[in-house]
Amino acid sequence: MAAKLTKKRKTLAEKVQRDKAYPLSEAIKLIKECAKAKFNESIDVAINLGIDSRKSDQAIRGATVLPHGSGRTVKVAVFAQGDNVEKAKAAGADIVGLDDLAERIQGGDIDFDVVIATPETMRVVGKLGQVLGPRGLMPNPKVGTVTTDVASAVKNAKQGQVRYRTDKNGIIHCTIGKVNFEEKALEENFLALLNDIKKAKPSAAKGTYLKKLTLSSTMGPGIAIDRTTVGA
């Protein structure tokens, strides 16, 4: 059975020409055709940027609210006090607290995907850097997770906001949806992310900024995107 599945996946993968860059709409269609796993695979993008990742002024970090969401159920924790506690809860936060939430995190209970904090609570949150930082959960104003408007931050997280940052090779990896999304929805999610990354271009970056764009599903082959079809 396993051999049969492998052969089928190989046949599907052969549809993709390795040396060809596809128009975005065609690439998305191919990815959906090649995604034959028994679970709802994620659609991921890798964007190679023409930056010097060794220089801090060229590192890129940000967040995009995908118009059609990411397909993930996101659990949100909020550090807040006063009126912001009720605002966070009303917006849909799963966990809201301050010192009690910090103790919970220090004890290893980290059952959430996004952490949001108001500026005045950072005196408490700042002490959790060694726990939250390595997990990519440390609140940061650059991605809107340190904010006075906790309600909007919670709603954005719940509605499909994705966070991104360049890795040591100057590549951004991000999920833009699931295989069961409509092709048009995936296309619009991709373009929303790409437009935000374009706006974040460092002034010090030289030459071609968007060097290579690749889409793939969790178990499928990578498909290069023709940059000219997305205004890159």
Curated annotation (Swiss-Prot):
GO terms (BP aspect): regulation of translation; translation
GO MF annotations in UniProt: rRNA binding; structural constituent of ribosome; tRNA binding
GO-annotated cellular components: cytosolic large ribosomal subunit
Signal peptide per UniProt: none
Keywords recorded for this protein, A-Z: Repressor, Ribonucleoprotein, Ribosomal protein, RNA-binding, rRNA-binding, Translation regulation, tRNA-binding
Gene3D superfamilies: 3.30.190.20, 3.40.50.790
Task performed by this protein: Binds directly to 23S rRNA. The L1 stalk is quite mobile in the ribosome, and is involved in E site tRNA release. Protein L1 is also a translational repressor protein, it controls the translation of the L11 operon by binding to its mRNA.
UniProt record similarity statement: Belongs to the universal ribosomal protein uL1 family.
Assembly and oligomerization: Part of the 50S ribosomal subunit.
Protein name (record): Large ribosomal subunit protein uL1
